[in-house]
Amino acid sequence: MPLNREDKQAVVAEVSAQVAKAQTVVLAEYRGIAVGDLTKLRAQAREQQVYLRVLKNTLARRAVEGTPFAPLAEQMTGPLIYGISEDAIAAAKVVNDFSKSNDKLVIKAGSFDGKVMDKAGVQALASIPSREELLSKLLFVMQSPVSSFARALAALAEKKQAEAA
């Protein structure tokens, strides 16, 4: 069913609001994907707070006009699903992980930090650990010397007690 003008304006406004908050946009061709698989992809995207939507390319072009993602308009051809996220790597990670298990989803392009990326660029972005993973690694690295020092002090205290007894 075709959208009337008001519906199109509402879609453009909704997508523009998402794009205004976004750090990353990923485009992927979804030709031939089963409905059940697409539903799984949408569920994974929701878990990661990724806005995932199939859009008419003309509406998507209007939504990205005047944003850092405007250069992506050249890539907006064919049946595309758009992944938009505030997290720098979430959209790339969700789409890339799903494309590994489903060869019918083909990453076409992406944009991060005002730069357009090809498939290899999106895959490289997806391979970066998330902020939470990096923070946990940093905490482990910072905690390791402290815990080693504490164990050394405890061993020294036990040794002193053994000598005193």
From Swiss-Prot:
GO terms for cellular component: ribonucleoprotein complex; ribosome. GO terms for biological process: translation. InterPro entries: Ribosomal_uL10, Ribosomal_uL10-like_sf, Ribosomal_uL10_bac, Ribosomal_uL10_bac_type. It comes from the Bacteria. Signal peptide: none annotated. Keywords: Ribonucleoprotein, Ribosomal protein, RNA-binding, rRNA-binding. Pfam families: Ribosomal_L10. GO terms for molecular function: large ribosomal subunit rRNA binding. Part of the ribosomal stalk of the 50S ribosomal subunit. The N-terminus interacts with L11 and the large rRNA to form the base of the stalk. The C-terminus forms an elongated spine to which L12 dimers bind in a sequential fashion forming a multimeric L10(L12)X complex. Forms part of the ribosomal stalk, playing a central role in the interaction of the ribosome with GTP-bound translation factors. Belongs to the universal ribosomal protein uL10 family. This is Large ribosomal subunit protein uL10. It comes from Burkholderia lata (strain ATCC 17760 / DSM 23089 / LMG 22485 / NCIMB 9086 / R18194 / 383). The gene is rplJ.
